[in-house]
């Protein structure tokens, strides 16, 4: 009887924690969608009134939008298997969308972007956009500071067998060998 009551108590506590976690995730998703409205308004205002000040505001606004997107994706990570929508995706359009979204960030950091992706692939478009965006942000963040190096990010595809490889290449500083085992840790930042 004692074990049964103890198990019941533990199960009730687990359900309560799961409910709290779901409520928190719902709150985060709601907050992200609410904050996107002013982000879009700022973006439109900056595009309609171009000068040095609005260009800088637009850059910072883009950083905020990228961080907000990251919050949303991390909030959804636990239920990622429910969030997949596998469909035929134009990889060139996806890569171009990321470069266009971040064009001011790329330009202000002197990074040239190039896309050569004539292929289609079956993938989840939201997640491939998120991954490409993170790789692009890291390419800029870890670009070479050597003035003789002209930073670039090159996104292209290669066919192999019946599949397609999506390759993201840059000429940045790279990740040190001793840090490679940590690259998939949440929040990992490599040393410069």
Regions found by a protein language model. Name each.
Residues 80-84, 120-123:
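Conserved micro-motifs of the catalytic ATP-binding
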Residues 71, 135:
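Hydrophobic residues in the alpha-helical elements that line and stabilize the ATP-binding pocket
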Residues 88-104:
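Short beta-to-alpha transition helix within the HATPase_c
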Residues 110-120:
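Conserved catalytic submotifs in the C-terminal HATPase_c
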Residues 150-162:
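Short beta-strand/loop element within the Bergerat-fold HATPase_c
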Residues 175-187:
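Short conserved segment of the HATPase_c
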């Amino acid at each position: 009887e004692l074990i049964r009551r103890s198990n019941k108590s533990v199960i009730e506590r687990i359900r309560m924690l799961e409910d709290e976690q779901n409520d928190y995730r719902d709150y985060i998703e709601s907050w992200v969608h609410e904050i996107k409205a002013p982000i879009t308004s700022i973006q439109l205002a900056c595009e309609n009134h171009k000068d040095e000040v609005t260009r800088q505001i637009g850059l910072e606004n883009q950083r905020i939008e990228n961080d907000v997107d990251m919050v949303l994706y991390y909030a959804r990570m636990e239920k990622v298997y429910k969030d997949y929508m596998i469909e035929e995706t134009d990889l060139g359009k996806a890569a171009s969308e990321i470069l266009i979204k971040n064009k001011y960030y790329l330009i202000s950091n002197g990074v040239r972007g190039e896309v050569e992706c004539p292929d289609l692939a079956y993938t989840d478009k939201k997640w491939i956009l998120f991954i490409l965006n993170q790789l692009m942000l890291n390419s800029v963040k870890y670009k070479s500071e050597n003035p003789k190096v002209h930073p670039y990010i090159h996104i292209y595809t290669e066919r192999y067998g019946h599949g397609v490889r999506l390759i993201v290449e840059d000429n940045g500083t790279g990740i040190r060998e001793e840090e490679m085992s940590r690259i998939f840790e949440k929040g990992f930042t490599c040393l410069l």
